[in-house]
Amino acid sequence: NCKSFAKLNLCLHILDRRKDGYHNLESIFCIIDFYDTLSFQKNNSNKLNFQTNSNEIDSTYNLVTKAYSVISNLYDIEGVDIYLDKKIPIGSGLGGGSSNAAVTLLALNEIFKLNISKDNLMKISEDIGADVPFFINGGAAYIGGKGDIVNNISVDKKYFVLILPNLKISTKDMYASLSSKDFMTQYSLDELMASNINSFEKIVMSKYPSLKETKYWLSAFGSVRMSGTG
């Protein structure tokens, strides 16, 4: 069994829109001790057999099956049974799907002794999702570009209380809602480390008033931040 950890954005600044349709961003990501579990077993069918306890995940097309397809197109690998025990809520801003994809790449690399270096695995993972390279790397990192620039940083040990409203917020929809007035100028690393700004927060709060009320109530108890796109 492999743990597939969630992440938090300690801040998330959107800088501009790229010609390829992605956005340039700056963020501080850190892994937290909250995780899904994936199990892997070779099979003789030369196909992927994917199952999960979540009825919200399309069992034929998701980031785990996409990760398997990417590797099977590049390397001659056998079939695998994969079971995903889902605990990280979908659409929660915690990167669960990207983490699942990264763990799948790492597991297939080990199971089939493909000897793909971490740098190459991170490069391969860019085609699966913008956050996947970070999860290949793990730890805490400065994230730049479209998510493909991952530089390790040191973050003091912190404790977080996760509040998970019963909402599913689409990353695609949130990026589509961005306009140039939401873009930010580039910060230094020290400024970024001290920031609690999330470029998506105003958009999310305007679309989901209940979330705005929740943040207002929680702010009486300490620093409140939003992770990811919600």
What role is predicted for each listed range?
Residues 1-4, 9-27, 114-223:
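ATP-dependent small-molecule kinase catalytic core of the GHMP/sugar-kinase superfamily
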